[in-house]
Regions:
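Sec-dependent N-terminal signal peptides
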Residues: 3-13
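Formylglycine-dependent sulfatase
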Residues: 15-160
Length: 160
């Protein structure tokens, strides 16, 4: 009887739909910089709607002082001194074990959309192509629509 229960339970678990996994990451956003935390200036209607439905971003911590080390830390679970991504301009090594690769092994389709900033120094807004040696595809993303970085190093363009 116990074996039958285990078999039935495993078949139910195997047939259950897997949850979608979406990681939202914003550069240089403080914990109180959302509408649902009553920021006096910033408007975040989509985040506010998710918070009203029960999803609040209140347990996420940066792995480094700037975006590239933090991105590497999030993707690998390792500190930036272990990934070798110490600052802007350092590429994530393709041999790193990443969250994207783990999700692929579990049968998920993976994608990256937005700022990558883990492929070394490139000009702002440069698209990341399939043959880039440090593309999202090299660390476990099936598809991506990503650019190297945005205009944070140009005082004029960063305001546009």
């Amino acid at each position: 009887m116990r074996l039958l229960f285990v078999l039935l339970l495993s078949s139910v678990v195997a047939s259950a739909d897997r949850p979608n996994v979406v990681l939202v990451m914003a550069d240089d956003q403080g914990w109180g910089q959302t509408g649902y935390y009553n920021h006096p200036v910033l408007k975040t209607p989509h985040l506010d709607a998710m918070a009203a439905a029960g999803l609040r971003f209140d347990r996420f911590y940066a792995g480094g002082p700037v975006c590239s080390p933090t991105r590497a830390t999030v993707l690998t679970g390792r500190s930036h001194d272990r990934t070798g991504v110490f600052d802007h301009g350092f590429a994530l090594r393709s041999q790193e074990k990443t969250l994207a690769r783990a999700l692929q092994r579990a049968g998920y389709a993976t994608g990256h959309f937005g700022k990558w900033h883990l492929n070394g120094l490139r000009g702002p807004g440069v698209p990341i192509l399939k043959d880039d040696t440090h593309s999202p595809g090299k660390v476990g993303f099936d598809v991506w629509l990503s650019v190297t970085n945005f205009f944070e190093r140009d005082p004029l363009l960063s305001r546009m």
